[in-house]
């Protein structure tokens, strides 16, 4: 149903945006050393997109039949207590593909149920490690064991409910600190989630340089 709806939209409404990315939360509960928030000086940016702006957004989404939306960008999406409701409103206004990105630290079983039943179609967990030691280097505020437990609980809840959605994606941004864990990461998660994504580093501090990025000094960005 989702694939058919997206195909219909692409065929008949290709003159409108097919995808929107909305920063529902500007805030983040982590302070990751290589995150663009720190590199670009956005670490002090906090707050949430207002209900008023979301109301306008949903009107436009419905009017133009936007098929796909990501309710995350640079902040931590789960800091919004009303996130499941925003997902439901997206669905009620005709969005077919609704995704979020999260570090997973704020999940619990009830929130997992709420997200799964809200109409969410994709969730991405930014993990980047397979050990507490490496996770601690990349996620200075993070608790690896808690995050892993939260992700496993989410998988278990989705399977118990009997849903095939949301599709679960784990991202691993390859850098000097974690490259030796890449294979173990795949082996740990290959039978548990729908997608495992290995991504290359990008140093946002050098992104302003028109001469390009030095591939030997790349920085992590969660996807």
Where are these regions (language model features)?
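Radical SAM enzyme [4Fe-4S]-AdoMet core and its adjacent flexible, acidic
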Residues: 23, 44, 49-52, 56-59, ...
